From Swiss-Prot:
Binds the 3'-UTR of mitochondrial mRNAs. Involved in the processing or stability of mitochondrial mRNAs. Residues 34-53, 60-79 are annotated as: Disordered. Monomer. It comes from the Eukaryota. It is a peripheral membrane protein. The gene is RMD9. The keyword Heme does not apply. This is RNA-binding protein RMD9, mitochondrial. Residues 1-37 form a transit peptide. The keyword Isomerase does not apply. It comes from Candida glabrata (strain ATCC 2001 / BCRC 20586 / JCM 3761 / NBRC 0622 / NRRL Y-65 / CBS 138) (Yeast).
Length: 616
């Protein structure tokens, strides 16, 4: 099946040429390209393509070993006479053992039921990472702190970032308060550690190699701190200008590093496309061999610049010259065409080939890429029918592959954003189309709670209580139990409706409290208080000239007065009162009345799990 690997983008050149914006000459060229491709395919059945088949199949079947030794096969010896001998050995042990653990693929660990080094299954992983940073600070002035040790530490921090992100993304529901706090703590630790190492590198306190710099930049990129990548890159350029022989200046031009920074530099308008292309060619010619990272970076840059033909040409070169161990780069680039190519016909072609499994490499179609494609379609021409077509296709595809509910939730959330944007001013036709979509989704996959919750949350743009009632009835119709999240959305939705009563607010609030209590909650969560705030305070602020606004503020104060004893702690109570008043001035104007409001009309729920942590 790999005989098409070297010809992949030849196929896609036809897609570019036959797009709506293509010229007649390009159409003719595309047809000729397809004829040539067909002829070559028939004439080379037993030629080089079959040899490539055999070689790649051999690699992927395990007959040819492509395993790489840790740290590139190098090992930094420790001099037993060194005064830092014990600490260096401890650091090497932390790096070697923990780096090997964290490099284990998540999918294999889950299928083998092996504990992954994450916050739940193996807290010693994070202890080792923390220990490694402590040892680094003790040792960074010693001569044995080699570029390989610093690189391994940065690599370990990068793996820690990915481990944390993979765990959060694999959850079927949002993380609880403790998990969320741990997640933030770990990300902050990694960010602070990388900043410290970056400063040491720029101040020439420690060395690093190209692989380490690549991991450093990639870590910042994955955390969303691309501005820091640009800052560090500029500082390295200044160092290189002042000292052309500096090691950091040389390794910054390594293809693996340039491949990471090229799309960032272009996106931040540090370089234009011609300058990016020049840097790519200089780097390619100097090293005189294929570096997949460099090609992926230039392809991403080309897509950002809307240089789609250039991107396809580079993709063809990448496919032609890559070895079996590089198929991951090809798969990554395939996804980039889906998510970043502004020529929708090209992006959709890449999506279709992945869905139909027509490629000689495996493509895991990330839902974020599909969401980006839908966004690009809406941005280009607001073609909702095309968006709906892709949504239906992917619901079917993900359903056939039995992917987790979070994938569908992300896809549906994106899709219904465009649906309600299209029908925002036409709720009669919109409701008719919504009913059809619910039926279609049920036929394709089956109705699930997140699907209905997304519609509940977004249909509030119509400000129509009957629509909310209709969606709520679907829970019973399709035998979908309403969770605590659903109850929050239903309370929050009252903030989109005029002329509601206090009884409606209180009824929805009690439903939340009792459900939380039945689940064993010890306190009323922030999300519960936020739903109450949106139903009352937020509506009051948006309609402050309406007499009813003061009524809703009164209801909020009454309910808080009765139920604030179930706050987790004093900081949570501050958040729902003074903290909330900072964003909503209408609440600040009435906050002093908290202890004066009449609470006799607010019933107190009988609870078993909720604890009175605070006194009123």
């Amino acid at each position: 099946m790999f005989r098409y690997l070297s010809r992949t983008s030849t196929i896609y050149k036809g897609v570019i040429a036959t797009s709506k914006t293509a010229s007649t000459a390009n159409v003719v060229a595309a047809q000729e390209s397809r004829r040539n491709y067909a002829n070559k395919r028939n004439n080379n059945r037993n030629g080089p393509a079959d040899a490539l088949d055999e070689k790649l199949n051999s690699i992927l079947s395990g007959k040819t070993s492509s395993k790489r030794k840790p740290y590139g096969g190098r090992k930094s010896p420790v001099d037993e006479t060194s005064p830092w001998y014990a600490q260096l050995c401890a650091l090497d042990d932390c790096l070697t053992t923990t780096l090997k653990q964290s490099a284990t693929p998540m999918r294999k660990l889950l299928s083998d039921r092996v504990n992954h080094p994450d916050m739940r299954s193996n807290p010693t992983f994070w202890h080792s990472v923390s220990r490694a940073m402590t040892l680094y600070n003790e040792l960074k002035q010693c001569p044995e702190m080699t570029d390989q040790r610093v690189t391994s530490l940065v690599h370990l921090l990068h793996n820690g970032l990915r481990t944390d992100r993979q765990l959060v993304s694999s959850l079927n529901k949002k993380p609880d308060y403790d998990s969320q706090s741990f997640h933030k703590e770990m990300v902050n630790f990694i960010y602070t550690s990388l900043n410290e190492i970056s400063d040491d590198i720029l101040n020439n306190n420690v060395p690093i190699n190209a692989n380490g710099l690549m991991h450093l930049f990639t870590s910042y990129q994955e955390m969303g701190f691309t501005d820091l990548v640009v800052q560090i890159w500029k500082k390295i350029e200044t160092i290189a200008e002042q000292n052309p022989q500096s090691n950091i200046g040389k390794i910054s031009k390594h293809p693996n590093v340039v491949g990471i920074v090229l799309p960032i530099l272009y996106e931040k308008e540090i370089v234009n496309f011609s300058e990016a292309e020049k840097l790519f060619k200089e780097c390619e010619q100097y090293h005189n061999r294929m570096f997949p990272n460099l090609y992926v970076g230039m392809i991403l840059t080309s897509l950002k610049a809307n240089e789609n033909m250039k991107a396809l040409e580079l993709f063809e070169t990448l496919c032609t010259n890559s070895k079996g161990v590089h198929y991951g780069y090809i798969s990554e680039t395939h996804i980039a065409f889906i998510s970043q190519c502004k020529d929708i016909s090209v992006a959709e072609s890449f999506l279709d080939k992945a869905v139909n499994n027509e490629m000689p490499y495996r493509v895991e179609i990330q839902v974020s890429a599909v969401n980006s494609l839908m966004y690009n379609i809406w941005s280009e021409n607001q073609d909702f029918n095309k968006i709906k077509e892709i949504w239906q296709k992917m619901v079917t595809f993900y359903g056939e592959n039995n992917l987790r509910l979070a994938i569908f939730s992300s896809l549906n959330n994106e899709f219904f954003s465009y649906f309600f944007e299209k029908y925002k001013e036409n709720k009669t036709e919109g409701l008719e189309q919504l009913q059809k979509l619910i039926t279609q989704y049920n036929n394709l996959k089956g109705i699930d709670e997140p699907f209905l919750n997304i519609i509940l949350a977004k249909c509030t743009v119509w400000k129509e209580p009957e629509v909310i009632k209709y969606i709520e009835k679907n829970f019973e119709l399709f035998n979908v139990p309403k969770s605590l999240i659903t109850s929050r959305i239903l309370l929050k939705s009252l903030g989109s409706i005029d002329n509601i009563t206090k009884e409606q607010i209180v009824e929805r609030w009690q439903e939340i409290v009792l459900k939380a209590d039945s689940l064993g909650s010890k306190y009323i969560a922030n999300a519960d208080w936020a739903a109450l705030r949106d139903a009352t305070v937020k509506w009051a602020q948006e309609n402050k000239d309406n007499q009813e606004s003061l009524d809703r503020i009164e209801w909020y104060l009454q309910i808080v007065n009765v139920y604030q004893k179930y706050c987790r702690d004093g900081s949570q109570r501050y958040r729902i009162l003074k903290g909330c008043s900072k964003s909503f001035p209408i609440l600040a104007e009435n906050l002093q009345r908290l202890d004066l409001v009449d609470t006799s009309s607010i019933p107190v729920c009988e609870v078993k799990s909720l604890k009175e942590a605070l006194q009123n």
